[in-house]
Regions:
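Class I SAM-dependent transferase core
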Residues: 1-67, 71, 104-118
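Conserved SAM/SAH cofactor-binding pocket of Class I
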Residues: 58-142, 152
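Conserved beta-strand segments of alpha/beta enzyme cores
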Residues: 95, 119-121, 164, 185-189
Length: 210
Protein backbone atom coordinates (compact mmCIF):
# COMPACT_ATOMS: atom_id res chain seq x y z
CA UNK A 1 0.00 0.00 0.00
CA UNK A 2 2.71 2.52 0.99
CA UNK A 3 4.86 1.52 -1.97
CA UNK A 4 1.95 2.17 -4.31
CA UNK A 5 1.34 5.56 -2.73
CA UNK A 6 5.02 6.47 -3.01
CA UNK A 7 5.05 5.53 -6.69
CA UNK A 8 1.86 7.51 -7.34
CA UNK A 9 3.38 10.58 -5.69
CA UNK A 10 6.53 10.39 -7.81
CA UNK A 11 4.42 9.91 -10.92
CA UNK A 12 2.72 13.28 -10.46
CA UNK A 13 5.39 15.31 -8.61
CA UNK A 14 8.64 13.91 -9.99
CA UNK A 15 11.52 12.63 -7.83
CA UNK A 16 10.59 12.83 -4.14
CA UNK A 17 12.57 11.55 -1.17
CA UNK A 18 11.20 8.97 1.22
CA UNK A 19 11.46 11.56 4.00
CA UNK A 20 9.18 13.94 2.09
CA UNK A 21 6.75 11.12 1.39
CA UNK A 22 6.69 10.30 5.11
CA UNK A 23 5.97 13.97 5.83
CA UNK A 24 2.94 13.92 3.54
CA UNK A 25 1.70 10.73 5.17
CA UNK A 26 2.09 12.38 8.59
CA UNK A 27 0.17 15.44 7.36
CA UNK A 28 -2.59 13.17 6.10
CA UNK A 29 -2.83 11.60 9.55
CA UNK A 30 -3.05 14.99 11.26
CA UNK A 31 -5.66 16.10 8.75
CA UNK A 32 -7.85 13.11 9.54
CA UNK A 33 -7.51 13.67 13.31
CA UNK A 34 -8.40 17.35 13.10
CA UNK A 35 -11.26 16.63 10.69
CA UNK A 36 -13.02 14.80 13.50
CA UNK A 37 -13.21 18.13 15.38
CA UNK A 38 -13.41 20.83 12.73
CA UNK A 39 -14.68 20.93 9.17
CA UNK A 40 -11.53 20.82 7.04
CA UNK A 41 -13.13 19.23 3.97
CA UNK A 42 -16.30 17.52 2.84
CA UNK A 43 -16.60 14.20 4.74
CA UNK A 44 -17.37 12.43 1.46
CA UNK A 45 -13.81 13.11 0.23
CA UNK A 46 -11.99 11.67 3.25
CA UNK A 47 -11.87 8.08 1.93
CA UNK A 48 -9.98 9.39 -1.11
CA UNK A 49 -7.90 12.05 0.66
CA UNK A 50 -4.55 10.92 -0.75
CA UNK A 51 -5.63 10.86 -4.39
CA UNK A 52 -8.22 13.62 -4.45
CA UNK A 53 -6.37 16.22 -2.40
CA UNK A 54 -2.70 15.36 -1.77
CA UNK A 55 -1.74 14.06 -5.21
CA UNK A 56 -3.95 16.67 -6.88
CA UNK A 57 -1.97 19.35 -5.04
CA UNK A 58 1.46 17.77 -5.54
CA UNK A 59 1.22 17.81 -9.32
CA UNK A 60 1.75 21.59 -9.35
CA UNK A 61 5.44 20.99 -8.65
CA UNK A 62 5.82 19.48 -12.12
CA UNK A 63 4.46 22.66 -13.71
CA UNK A 64 6.75 25.03 -11.79
CA UNK A 65 9.76 22.92 -10.76
CA UNK A 66 12.14 25.87 -10.31
CA UNK A 67 9.83 28.01 -8.15
CA UNK A 68 10.93 28.49 -4.54
CA UNK A 69 8.50 31.18 -3.33
CA UNK A 70 4.83 30.20 -3.37
CA UNK A 71 1.69 31.94 -2.13
CA UNK A 72 -1.49 29.94 -1.50
CA UNK A 73 -4.69 31.99 -1.24
CA UNK A 74 -7.61 30.68 0.80
CA UNK A 75 -5.64 27.66 1.97
CA UNK A 76 -8.52 25.99 3.81
CA UNK A 77 -7.34 22.59 5.01
CA UNK A 78 -4.02 22.96 3.21
CA UNK A 79 -4.60 22.07 -0.42
CA UNK A 80 -2.50 22.82 -2.31
CA UNK A 81 -0.45 25.09 -0.01
CA UNK A 82 0.46 22.66 2.77
CA UNK A 83 1.39 19.94 0.30
CA UNK A 84 3.62 22.35 -1.62
CA UNK A 85 5.25 23.46 1.65
CA UNK A 86 6.11 19.88 2.60
CA UNK A 87 7.49 19.18 -0.86
CA UNK A 88 9.59 22.36 -0.66
CA UNK A 89 11.58 20.95 2.27
CA UNK A 90 13.79 19.33 -0.37
CA UNK A 91 14.44 22.62 -2.12
CA UNK A 92 15.88 25.01 0.46
CA UNK A 93 15.92 27.93 0.61
CA UNK A 94 12.20 28.08 -0.08
CA UNK A 95 9.09 29.59 1.47
CA UNK A 96 5.37 29.02 1.08
CA UNK A 97 2.94 31.62 2.44
CA UNK A 98 -0.53 30.27 3.25
CA UNK A 99 -3.40 32.74 3.75
CA UNK A 100 -6.46 31.43 5.60
CA UNK A 101 -8.89 33.69 7.46
CA UNK A 102 -10.70 30.88 9.30
CA UNK A 103 -8.95 30.75 12.67
CA UNK A 104 -9.55 27.06 13.31
CA UNK A 105 -8.24 26.04 9.90
CA UNK A 106 -5.28 28.38 10.29
CA UNK A 107 -4.52 26.83 13.69
CA UNK A 108 -4.53 23.37 12.12
CA UNK A 109 -2.13 24.52 9.41
CA UNK A 110 0.21 26.23 11.88
CA UNK A 111 0.31 23.24 14.22
CA UNK A 112 0.67 20.48 11.64
CA UNK A 113 3.21 22.24 9.42
CA UNK A 114 5.34 23.42 12.35
CA UNK A 115 5.63 19.84 13.57
CA UNK A 116 6.88 18.85 10.11
CA UNK A 117 9.30 21.80 9.94
CA UNK A 118 7.87 22.83 6.58
CA UNK A 119 9.31 26.08 5.17
CA UNK A 120 6.13 28.12 5.41
CA UNK A 121 4.30 30.96 7.12
CA UNK A 122 0.58 30.75 7.87
CA UNK A 123 -1.26 34.08 7.79
CA UNK A 124 -4.59 33.89 9.71
CA UNK A 125 -5.97 36.90 7.86
CA UNK A 126 -8.13 37.95 4.95
CA UNK A 127 -6.29 38.05 1.66
CA UNK A 128 -6.83 41.80 1.32
CA UNK A 129 -5.16 42.37 4.68
CA UNK A 130 -1.96 40.72 3.45
CA UNK A 131 -1.20 43.20 0.67
CA UNK A 132 2.20 44.73 1.28
CA UNK A 133 3.01 42.21 4.01
CA UNK A 134 3.90 39.14 1.94
CA UNK A 135 6.93 39.42 -0.36
CA UNK A 136 6.22 38.92 -4.07
CA UNK A 137 5.97 35.19 -4.80
CA UNK A 138 6.94 33.40 -7.97
CA UNK A 139 3.76 31.32 -8.04
CA UNK A 140 0.27 31.93 -6.64
CA UNK A 141 -2.09 29.01 -6.08
CA UNK A 142 -5.77 28.74 -5.23
CA UNK A 143 -8.10 25.76 -5.21
CA UNK A 144 -11.89 25.93 -4.89
CA UNK A 145 -11.69 29.53 -3.69
CA UNK A 146 -13.58 31.77 -6.14
CA UNK A 147 -14.43 32.31 -9.84
CA UNK A 148 -11.60 33.57 -12.03
CA UNK A 149 -12.69 37.24 -12.17
CA UNK A 150 -12.70 37.36 -8.36
CA UNK A 151 -9.40 35.49 -8.10
CA UNK A 152 -7.77 37.94 -10.47
CA UNK A 153 -8.83 40.85 -8.30
CA UNK A 154 -7.45 39.16 -5.18
CA UNK A 155 -4.15 38.16 -6.79
CA UNK A 156 -3.55 41.34 -8.79
CA UNK A 157 -1.18 43.09 -6.34
CA UNK A 158 1.25 40.16 -6.44
CA UNK A 159 0.80 39.33 -10.10
CA UNK A 160 1.60 42.92 -11.06
CA UNK A 161 5.01 42.25 -9.51
CA UNK A 162 5.57 39.34 -11.88
CA UNK A 163 4.02 36.29 -10.23
CA UNK A 164 2.15 33.70 -12.24
CA UNK A 165 -0.85 31.74 -10.99
CA UNK A 166 -1.59 28.01 -11.07
CA UNK A 167 -5.30 27.57 -10.50
CA UNK A 168 -7.28 24.35 -10.19
CA UNK A 169 -10.53 24.65 -12.13
CA UNK A 170 -13.40 22.30 -12.95
CA UNK A 171 -15.35 21.49 -16.07
CA UNK A 172 -16.85 25.00 -16.40
CA UNK A 173 -13.49 26.73 -16.59
CA UNK A 174 -14.04 27.98 -20.16
CA UNK A 175 -17.05 30.02 -19.05
CA UNK A 176 -14.97 31.58 -16.28
CA UNK A 177 -12.20 32.41 -18.74
CA UNK A 178 -14.68 34.09 -21.09
CA UNK A 179 -16.22 36.10 -18.26
CA UNK A 180 -12.77 37.28 -17.19
CA UNK A 181 -11.89 38.64 -20.62
CA UNK A 182 -14.28 41.58 -20.25
CA UNK A 183 -12.13 43.21 -17.57
CA UNK A 184 -8.77 41.44 -17.68
CA UNK A 185 -6.00 40.69 -20.11
CA UNK A 186 -3.72 37.72 -19.43
CA UNK A 187 -1.70 34.91 -20.93
CA UNK A 188 -3.21 31.46 -20.48
CA UNK A 189 -1.84 27.93 -20.61
CA UNK A 190 -4.06 24.92 -19.91
CA UNK A 191 -2.53 21.91 -18.18
CA UNK A 192 -4.27 18.57 -17.92
CA UNK A 193 -5.08 17.39 -14.42
CA UNK A 194 -2.87 14.32 -14.20
CA UNK A 195 -4.71 12.92 -11.20
CA UNK A 196 -7.95 12.42 -13.08
CA UNK A 197 -11.35 13.97 -13.43
CA UNK A 198 -12.41 16.52 -16.01
CA UNK A 199 -10.75 19.54 -14.44
CA UNK A 200 -7.67 21.47 -15.53
CA UNK A 201 -4.91 23.58 -14.05
CA UNK A 202 -4.81 27.06 -15.55
CA UNK A 203 -1.46 28.83 -15.72
CA UNK A 204 -2.04 32.58 -15.77
CA UNK A 205 0.67 35.18 -16.37
CA UNK A 206 0.97 38.84 -17.41
CA UNK A 207 -2.31 39.74 -15.69
CA UNK A 208 -3.51 43.28 -16.41
CA UNK A 209 -6.69 45.30 -16.14
CA UNK A 210 -8.30 46.42 -19.40
Amino acid sequence: MMAERFSALQAVAGPVSRETFDGLVAFEGEFRKWSARINLTAPSTLPHLWERHILDSAQLIRIAPAARRWLDLGSGGGFPGAVIAILMKEHAPAQVDLVESNRKKAAFLQTSLASLKAPCVVHPQRIEDCYGKIPPPEVITARALAPLPVLFGLAEPWMKAGARALLHKGRDYRREVEESCDAWGFNLLEHNNEVGGDGVILEISDLRRL
